[in-house]
Amino acid sequence: MAEDVKPTRKNLMAIDDRIQLSERGHDTLEQKRDGLIMEFMDILDQAQDVRSDLNANYETAQQKLNMARAMEGDVAVRGAAAALKEHPEITTRSKNIMGVVVPQIESSRVKKSLDQRGYGLLGSSARIDEAADAYEELIETIILAAEVETAMKKMLKEIETTKRRVNALEFKLLPDLYENKEYIEQKLEEQEREEIFRLKKIKNKKEAEEEDEDEDESEMTDETVVQTPADD
C-alpha cells in the first residue's frame, strides 16, 4: 500500500532507482522470453519430425519382425535376439540453450554388423537382418525423440517461469512502485505548499508587526513634537 511508504525525498529517490532497475529487468526478461519461444518453436518442429519418424520406423520395424517370424519362425527370431552380446551404450551430456540446461543424449553400438549381433552369417537370414536393421534404426530414433522431447519440456517450463516473472513485474511490482512514487510526490507537493503557506504567513505576520512598530514610532514622534515647547 502506498500509505505505508514514508513520503520523503530519500524514499522517492530509492523508488526511482527500483523503477529503473525493474524496467531494465522487465525488458531483459521479455527478450529472454521471446528468445526462448523462438528456440522452443524450432525444437517443436524438430520434435514433430522426430515423432513422425518414430511412428514410421516403429511401423516398419513391426512389419519386418512379423515378416521374419512368418518366414523364419519364432524360434529362429528369438535365437537371433538371444545371440546379441553387445548392448547399446547411452551417455548424456548437457548443453545450454539461453540459460536452460537440456540433455544431449549420445548413443553408441546401436547399429551393428552381423558379427556384432552375435549370430553371424550362418545363423541369420535376410529377413532377420532386415528386422534387426529396422529395430536398430527405431532405437536411434527413440533416443533422439527422448532428447528432443525432454529439451522441449524443459524449455516450455522455463518459458512459463519467465512469463510469470514478466507478468509479476508488469502487472504487480511496477504498478505498485509507480503508485508509491505518485503518492510520495503528491505528499511532498502538499508539504511544500504547506511550507510555503507557513513561511508566507510568518512573513505577513512579521511585516504586520513591523508596520505596527512603525506606526507606534510615528505616533511617539508626533507626540514628542506636540509636547516640545515653542521657542519664545
UniProtKB/Swiss-Prot annotation:
Alphabetical keyword list: ATP synthesis, Cell membrane, Hydrogen ion transport, Ion transport, Membrane, Transport
Single GO biological process annotation from the record: proton motive force-driven plasma membrane ATP synthesis
Single GO molecular function: proton-transporting ATP synthase activity, rotational mechanism
One annotated Gene Ontology cellular component of this protein: plasma membrane
Coiled coil: none
Compartments (UniProt record): Cell membrane
InterPro entries: V_ATPase_D
Record's bilayer topology term: Peripheral membrane protein
Main location: membrane
Region (Disordered): 200-232
Biased composition (Acidic residues): 209-222
Membership in a protein family: Belongs to the V-ATPase D subunit family.
PANTHER family the record matches: V-TYPE ATP SYNTHASE SUBUNIT D
Subunit structure as annotated in this protein's UniProt entry: Has multiple subunits with at least A(3), B(3), C, D, E, F, H, I and proteolipid K(x).
Job description of the protein: Component of the A-type ATP synthase that produces ATP from ADP in the presence of a proton gradient across the membrane.
Name by which UniProt lists this protein: A-type ATP synthase subunit D
Origin organism lineage: Archaea, Methanobacteriati, Methanobacteriota, Stenosarchaea group, Halobacteria
